[in-house]
Amino acid sequence: MGVEKIKAAFENGKKAFIPYVMGGDGGLEKLKERIRFLDEAGASIVEIGIPFSDPVADGPTIQRAGKRALDSGVTLKGIFQALAEVRKEVQMPFVLMTYLNPVLAFGKERFIENCIEAGVDGIIVPDLPYEEQNIIAPLLREVNIALIPLVTVTSPIERIEKITSESEGFVYAVTVAGVTGVRQNFKEEIHSYLEKVKSHVNLPVVAGFGISTKEHVEEMVTICDGVVVGSKVIELLENEKREEICELIYATKQKEEA
């Protein structure tokens, strides 16, 4: 469980496809069913979003999914229970994407206990600055759950080194300045940014934010170790276009042979 399980997703040159699903969008049974589908389809890791009323890093698609989940009365406790149930059936690592407020409102210790029971392997907290990560990092380290760092295009290399020096799991490299969402293409400087991050950190580097097509996936995994696909996966699940998710997974895995 935990850090080692995430590490295994990248071993021997594997390229990781990491889909994002919003916890409770469509109900908790739907969450479990979607995780089972993604596991069977060959996803490497699944990222589960915790719905929050003020999601500052999320684009419109993920915001709408979070609102649907909150409007349906889904709770953090309910999401943990659903994950604990589906964990018995799937092997891929679970990574939670949560803002800090739900963690503090739930109680840090209680949150981590529930993570353990649900088989959570890593956590991303997009609004937790590096300078404040001791709020939760030592508690996670004690139980072998990875606190996964986010680095951005605007981060100086010294800061990237600092942020990632004590991190575990993988580095989430944000490929755009702004919120999540589908984009048409990536600028040339994104390539040099990802190459720079790769050359300065000792963890796998995963690109995320704005990745939505097979071409995007192929472009990104040529440079880094995997991709997170969020808004597009939510859209495809909502519209029952699951074969297109399988195509994105296939595009990722194809690059392992290269």
Curated annotation (Swiss-Prot):
Pathway the protein contributes to: Amino-acid biosynthesis; L-tryptophan biosynthesis; L-tryptophan from chorismate: step 5/5
EC number(s) on file: 4.2.1.20
Q: Write down what this protein is called.
A: Tryptophan synthase alpha chain
Q: Say which family it is in.
A: Belongs to the TrpA family.
Fetch the InterPro entries from UniProt.
Aldolase_TIM, RibuloseP-bd_barrel, Trp_synthase_alpha_AS, Trp_synthase_suA
Q: Which terms under GO biological process does the entry name? A: L-tryptophan biosynthetic process
Q: Which GO terms describe its cellular component?
A: cytosol
Listed Gene3D superfamilies: Aldolase class I
Q: Which GO terms describe its molecular function?
A: tryptophan synthase activity
> Subunit arrangement?
Tetramer of two alpha and two beta chains.
Query: What Pfam families does UniProt report for this protein, alphabetically?
Result: Trp_syntA (PF00290)
Which terms are listed as keywords in the entry? Amino-acid biosynthesis, Aromatic amino acid biosynthesis, Lyase, Tryptophan biosynthesis
Q: What does this protein do?
A: The alpha subunit is responsible for the aldol cleavage of indoleglycerol phosphate to indole and glyceraldehyde 3-phosphate.
Query: What are the catalytic residues?
Result: E47, D58
Recorded catalytic reaction(s): these are: (1S,2R)-1-C-(indol-3-yl)glycerol 3-phosphate + L-serine = D-glyceraldehyde 3-phosphate + L-tryptophan + H2O
